[in-house]
Amino acid sequence: CGHATLATAHCLKAHLNYPNEDICFKTKSGTLNVCFKNGLYELNLPNRVGKPAALPGEIANALNIQPKEVYKARDYLLVYQSQTEIETLKIERSIFDQINIDPGGVIVTAVGKDSDFVSRFFTPQASILEDPVTGSSHCTLIPYWFKRLQKKELKAKQLSKRGGDIGCIYKGSRVQINGAA
C-alpha cells in the first residue's frame, strides 16, 4: 500500500542514508516514485474514480450505520453524513467476512471537523480488519473529495486507532499523497 511505500522510503533515507531525494520502487503494480521534499515524503499514484453502485447485502448487514452514498472503484467507497458517524462506525466481522472483494476493501468517509475529510479502511477476510493508514484508498478518496469540495489540495485524516494525517493533491488522472515519518 502507499503508506508502507512511504514508510520504506523513510527507512532508506533515515536509517540507511540513501543519498537521493527521489526513490524509485519497482512493484507488482508498477513503478512507484517517492520524493522527499520539505520534510515530507510524496507519492504519486493513478487515481481510481468510483462510480455509483449498490451496496452488497453482506456489507450493509455488517454495518451499524448505513451510508448516504455508495461508489465502487477497486474498493467500495461509502460516504457518510459526519465525522462522528465515521468515529462510531462498527462492523460485525462475522457478517463482513462473508463477502469477497479481493483485492479491494471498504472505505468509509465523511467531511472532517479539523481536516477536509476523514476516512477508515476495512478489508474482509484479512488478518487485520481495519488498516491503520491506507495510502491506496486515497486513490479513490481524493477524486471524490476534489469534485465535492472543489479543492485540489486537501487535508485528510484516517481515524483508525493509530490514525494518521495525509496531505492530498488532485492531479487529474493521478493523485499525490504526502506525509511525515
Feature-to-residue mapping (PLM):
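Active-site proximal loop and beta-alpha junction motif in alpha/beta enzyme cores
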Residues: 1, 6-181
